[in-house]
Every structure is written in C-alpha cells, then in structure tokens.
C-alpha cells in the first residue's frame, strides 16, 4: 500500500465516532429522552471539534501549507475533506431532530412549539415572559460609527436585527446586534396547562424573534436572524515570558472567548446579504458557514430530559456494587494491606477511593497525602478531604493540571482553595500535561512508614465515575507505591527521571514499553509461537505504534483493538493488517478505560493505564501504566475489560479498511451479548 494511505485522517475518524454516537439517537431501542441526550452530546462534541481540531488545521494551513499531515494530505486538502464530512453529519443531525425526534416526542406529549403554532394563551404567557425575564436584561447595539460591530463571545447566541426608520436622535437605522446572555435558558418550559397537560417548550430564539421590536421602540423590524460564532479555543502560554502559570492561565481564559473564528452558524432562512455581512465581520469564507434548519445550538436541548418527569422515557437507574469487605473492617488500609482492591467503575462504586482520602484526612497515623488532579468537577469530596487533611496539619501535596482543556477555570479555583487550606499545590511540569491519575497516602504503622497508592485510568471525578467506564487499583505493593512516590518527586522537584520498579511512565518509558511488547509478540509469531495483542483505549493515532502493529500483523500476530474514538490504523488490509481487528463500543456508558494485554507465551502481561496510544500521551504528557499481576485481578481485567468487549454484538461497531464502521449484530442462532448490561449484572448492586 502506498505510504500516504497507511494512516487515516484523524479528524475524519473523530467525525466517524460522532456518527456512531448519533446512531444512538436514531436507535429505537434507546429510551426516547436518552436519544435526545445523545443528539446533544454530538452537538457538544462538534463544538469542541471546531474549537480544537478545525482550528488546528486552519493554523497548520496558515503556517505550513505544503507540509503533509500523517494521512499523507496537505492541510488544505484535509480541511476540504473534513468540511464536507462535518456538513453531512450536521445535516443528518438536524434531519433527525426535526423529522424523527420531534414527532416522536410529540406523540409522548412533549412539544417544541414554533411561533406559527402558538395559541393565544401561549402567546400571552410568552409575551409576559419576555417583558419580565428578557427585556430588562437584553442590550441592543445599533451599528453606526460610534457603535462598531461587537465581539461576540465564543459559542454565544446572537441576533442580527434589520431595522427601518430613525431613532430618538434622528439617526437613520440599518442594523443592530442583540446578544443573548449565557445565563438565559435557551429552551423555556411552558406551564403544563398551556400544553394540554403535557410538556411544552419554546426556544429562546423564537421568543426573541417574536418580541425583538420592543427593544427598538418606534422602529420597524424588517428581519431578525440568529447566528453563533465558534472560535479557536486553544490556550497559548509563552514559556519565556512566564512568571506565574496560574495568572497566565486566568488571562488566557478571557482571551479564549475572543479567539479567531472557525465556524459561523446561521438559520437556513438567513438572507444571503446578511450571511455575507457576518462572514466579512469575522473574516471567514463561505466554506466556514453552516446553515442549519433549527436552533443554532442543539447542545442546550440537554436541559429537556431533566425538566420532563418521564422515567419510562429514560434509562433505568443502576446501583453500583459496593465492596462487602469494606463494611466488615474498620479501616480501608487494613483491607488493602491484605490484598489490592480492583475497582471497575461505574459498575462498582467510586466510594472506596473517596473513603481512602477521607480516612487519610482523619487518621492521626497518616503523615502525608499526595494526589494529581486533572478533572474533578465543581464539587469534589476528594478535594474537600485533601483540604481537611491539610487543615489537620498533614503534609498534603496536590499536582493540579491547570491546562486540562475546558476545565482550566475549575482547576484554578480548586488550586486557590487548596493553597488557602495549607496544601502544597504545584502545577506540574511546564510543557507536559499531568494526565496520570495517582494518589499516595503515607502512614505510620508499628513505628515504620507504610505507603498506599491508588492508580486509575480515569479522573478523580465523582460525577464522571458514574458515567465513564474506568479501572482503578488501590494497593500497598511496596514497589508500586515506591514508584508512585518517585513520580511525585519528579513532578514536584528537580532532577533526572528516577528508576521505576514496576510502573511505566510517559514521556520516558511508556512508548518504548509498548513498542518493545509489540516487537516481542512479533518475534514470537515469527518463531511459530502463539502471539496475541489485545488492547482497549479511547484513541489510536500514534504512527510508530501503528507501524509496529502492521509489522506484527504481517508476522502473524493476532491483534484485537477496542478503540472507542479515533483510530487512524487501517484494519483488515491484505498484506498490511489482515490480522488486525478494530471495534468500537458505543453505549449508555462512555468507554474510557485503557487496558493493554500482551500474550507473552501465555504470561498475558496486562496493564491499566491513563494513556491512549497518541503522540500527546506518549511524548507531551505525564502518564502511567501499572501492571496487574495478582492472578484474580488480572483475570478480572482481561475478562471485564477485553474479552466481554470482544464478545459484544449489540453495541459494537466493526471498523472497515476504509475507516468506515458496520454495526455488529448477533449471528443466526447466536444470543445477544451486551457488554455494559452484562457488567451491571455481574458487578452492580
């Protein structure tokens, strides 16, 4: 195969992932309000796609227009391909909302009322709502030499209003801009009695369209057109000018709202001259214009399921399983001393991790606590426990990653609170994101210091621990806990990388470990020995790993990859990758665990990791991979993390050589296998 065709386009692969998510919104086996949630997830993902990936392609095209990307194409060619795919996905999305989901919701007495269908009573209520809730807040900006075109915030809802007449000062009118503050709901619920006893909603844009004239008394409103600008949201911090990372991040967060435009969304009814006017204001081309049939921000529909009390239209609730042994012992440390604890979230409760930190904060024998924070949410019992530990006089060290994309403001806030409580807060290593998920407790027992560690594949975030699938291990293994301590010393101090006993870390040893393990399986296959690689991750795009997998496949290694999102490897290509199979699991839970298993002559070397197989994870982040060696725990990780995923025939998508996906289905006579439901049955409470 030609060199330029060996690696697929990562942006097209990411859009393909969102097509699989959108398929959940089409699936009639998914409860109706959950289908609406999946539609919103796709919209949110697309926003981030334009803010990050499309923005990067634009910058690359500007700086290096002739440099070929990993997919063998130049940036301009890739932008054209990606734009076409994005347009197709967005059209599909709005068709689904307008022609499928809205009619099905209406049959369940859940209505989205358009202006032309408002009853007299609804019109009266909506006008009162506008006068009471919107009119005092909205600020129209007339465009003239003393009122230049305003800078809309990233992803904010705005309206271009065409006017006729003269204002109070005798100025001729032309156009004004109305910005809808973010505090306003984009979907407004109507009283039940106005909706025949059901649920009714109107879009904020419809309310404003109907009453925008009240913002311009005495003027004639000729047209009102909603628009939304998506901006480049990359944060850039100059290392040479850097004095205080936290202050620099706070400044950049403000600037992010006003980055370069990358996408302009307007309604499909917007006239051409208004579209052209807006494109000129934002220095965008027609290729960056997206006309949609409906509200320009479907993300805000995610409020609707929470406003509708219809359990029959939502997923049934599940209760995470709890460790029975934890209730039989006075201390989690006593339990972990006996044997390590493996947790598989959300099927098993995240509580043992929280309990470990709570107990550490209250235990007089605990001397020090260390933890990394990447994403932890706006409310965190874990961080509260760290603050209590610091206030109790314990040595508390917290590595807060301030550059966690779209969580920067939240992490800045936690860093301030932790410092005020007396914790030592460090911001990692400039130029490397601290993505490792690790915690360490140092406790005095019988006159000697004993260490306990937690290592995980997911964030210390109690909210996402109920949605994302992840593994975590709590252990007192002396070599692993010593390694975790070494990693904290590396991050917080200065010096050369320490020698690790069992853990592998990025950016120093993890990539080499993966390459070496693949090479070993390759040699075993060449020698006629059984050789197999099974791995699960969010993304696979690192070219040297992909080439190593191609070599392994050519040698006869059987390779099964479970890649939820981006995958730029081509599976099943004769002479290149015929022994590689790739599948993606898309279901109620977001598959987030990273698990690697290398057969190694039957030893089945198994690791859980914070790292995907991407260049950023191997070379620009601090990551960990921990071996799972206890026989029962290894058996669980292989079964729950890999084998059951490979058996799934209800939510699995099978990747094709061209980068497309086909949904798996049970063969004739084969029973259904549903990874996530089966794990709830196996592990849930």
Curated annotation (Swiss-Prot):
Write out the residues that bind Mg(2+).
375, 405
Q: Which residues constitute the catalytic centre?
A: 435
Q: Does the keyword Magnesium apply?
A: yes
Asked whether the UniProt record includes Phosphoprotein among its keywords, one would answer yes
What's the name of the protein? Polyphosphate kinase
Q: What are the record's GO terms for cellular component? A: polyphosphate kinase complex
Binding-site residues, ATP? 45, 468, 564, 592
- Cross-referenced Pfam families, in alphabetical order? PP_kinase, PP_kinase_C, PP_kinase_C_1, PP_kinase_N
Q: List the disulfide bonds.
A: none
At the top of the EC hierarchy, this enzyme's class is transferase
According to its UniProt record, the EC number is 2.7.4.1
User: What reaction does this catalyse?
Assistant: [phosphate](n) + ATP = [phosphate](n+1) + ADP
GO MF annotations for this entry?
ATP binding; metal ion binding; polyphosphate kinase activity
Fetch the InterPro entries from UniProt.
PP_kinase, PP_kinase_C_1, PP_kinase_middle, PP_kinase_middle_dom_sf, PPK_C_dom2, PPK_N_dom, PPK_N_dom_sf
Task: Name the coenzymes or cofactors required.
Answer: Mg(2+)
**UniProt modification remark:** An intermediate of this reaction is the autophosphorylated ppk in which a phosphate is covalently linked to a histidine residue through a N-P bond.
What gene codes for this chain?
A: ppk
Q: Give the organism, scientific name.
A: Neisseria meningitidis serogroup A / serotype 4A (strain DSM 15465 / Z2491)
User: What does the UniProt keyword field contain?
Assistant: ATP-binding, Kinase, Magnesium, Metal-binding, Nucleotide-binding, Phosphoprotein, Transferase
- What is known about what this protein does? Catalyzes the reversible transfer of the terminal phosphate of ATP to form a long-chain polyphosphate (polyP).
The record's HAMAP family line, in alphabetical order, gives: Polyphosphate_kinase (MF_00347)
Similarity comment: Belongs to the polyphosphate kinase 1 (PPK1) family.
């Amino acid at each position: 195969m030609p060199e330029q065709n060996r690696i697929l386009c990562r942006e097209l692969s990411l859009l393909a992932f969102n097509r699989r998510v959108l398929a959940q919104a089409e699936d009639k086996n998914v409860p109706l309000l959950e289908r609406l949630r999946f539609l919103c997830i796709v919209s949110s993902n697309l926003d981030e796609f334009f803010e990050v990936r499309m923005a990067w392609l634009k910058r690359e095209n500007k700086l290096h227009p002739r440099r070929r990307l990993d997919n063998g194409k130049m940036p301009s060619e890739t932008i054209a391909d990606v734009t076409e795919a994005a347009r197709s996905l967005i059209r599909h999305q709005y068709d689904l909302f307008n022609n499928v989901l809205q009619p099905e919701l209406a049959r369940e007495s859940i209505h989205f009322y358009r202006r032309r269908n408002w009853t007299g009573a609804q019109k009266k209520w909506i006008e009162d709502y506008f006068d009471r809730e919107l009119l005092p807040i909205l600020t129209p900006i007339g465009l003239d030499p003393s009122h230049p075109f305003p800078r809309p915030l990233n992803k904010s809802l705005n309206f271009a209003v065409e006017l006729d007449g003269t204002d109070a000062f005798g100025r001729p009118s032309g156009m004004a801009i109305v910005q809808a503050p973010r505090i306003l709901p984009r979907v407004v619920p109507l009283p039940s009695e106005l909706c025949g006893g059901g649920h009714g909603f109107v879009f904020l844009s419809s309310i404003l369209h109907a009453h925008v004239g009240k913002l311009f008394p005495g003027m004639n409103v000729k047209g009102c057109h909603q628009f939304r600008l998506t901006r480049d949201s990359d944060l850039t911090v100059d290392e040479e000018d850097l004095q205080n990372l936290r202050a620099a991040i706070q400044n950049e967060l403000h600037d992010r709202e006003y980055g370069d435009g990358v996408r302009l969304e307007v309604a499909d009814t917007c006239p051409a001259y208004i579209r052209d006017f807006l494109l000129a204001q934002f220095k965008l081309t027609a290729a960056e214009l997206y006309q949609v049939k409906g509200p320009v921000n479907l993300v805000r529909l995610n409020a609707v399921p929470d406003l509708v009390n219809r359990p029959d239209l939502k997923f049934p609730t599940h209760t995470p399983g709890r460790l029975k042994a934890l209730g039989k012992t006075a201390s989690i440390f006593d339990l972990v001393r006996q044997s390590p604890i493996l947790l598989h979230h959300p099927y098993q409760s995240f509580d043992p991790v929280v309990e470990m930190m709570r107990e550490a904060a209250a235990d007089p024998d605990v001397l020090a606590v260390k933890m990394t924070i990447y994403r932890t949410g706006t409310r965190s019992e874990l961080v509260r426990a760290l603050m209590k530990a610091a206030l109790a006089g314990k040595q508390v060290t917290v590595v807060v990653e301030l550059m966690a994309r779209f969580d920067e403001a939240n992490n800045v806030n936690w860093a301030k609170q932790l410092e005020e409580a007396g914790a030592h807060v460090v911001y990692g290593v400039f130029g490397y994101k601290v993505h490792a998920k690790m915690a360490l407790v140092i406790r005095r027992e019988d006159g000697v210091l004993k260490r306990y560690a937690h290592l995980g594949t997911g964030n210390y975030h109690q909210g996402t621990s109920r949605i994302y699938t992840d593994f975590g291990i709590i252990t007192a293994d002396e070599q692993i806990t010593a390694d975790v301590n070494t990693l904290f010393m590396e991050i917080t101090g200065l010096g050369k990388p320490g020698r690790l006993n069992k853990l592998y870390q990025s950016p120093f040893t993890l990539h080499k470990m993966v390459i070496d393990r693949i090479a070993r399986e390759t040699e075993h296959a060449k020698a006629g020995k059984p050789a197999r690689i099974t791995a699960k991750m969010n993304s696979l795009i690192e070219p040297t790993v992909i080439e190593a997998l191609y070599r392994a496949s050519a040698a006869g290694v059987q390779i099964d990859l479970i890649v939820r999102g981006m995958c730029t490897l081509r599976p099943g290509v004769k002479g290149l990758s015929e022994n590689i199979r790739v599948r993606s699991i898309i279901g109620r839970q977001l598959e987030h665990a990273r698990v690697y298993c290398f057969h190694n002559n039957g030893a089945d070397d198994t690791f859980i990791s914070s790292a995907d197989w991407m260049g950023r994870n191997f070379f620009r982040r601090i990551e960990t991979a921990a071996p799972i060696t206890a026989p029962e725990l290894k058996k669980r990780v292989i079964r729950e993390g890999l084998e059951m995923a490979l058996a799934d025939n209800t939510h699995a998508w099978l990747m094709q050589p061209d980068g497309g996906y086909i949904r798996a289905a049970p063969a004739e006579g084969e029973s259904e296998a549903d990874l996530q439901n089966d794990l709830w049955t196996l592990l849930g409470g």
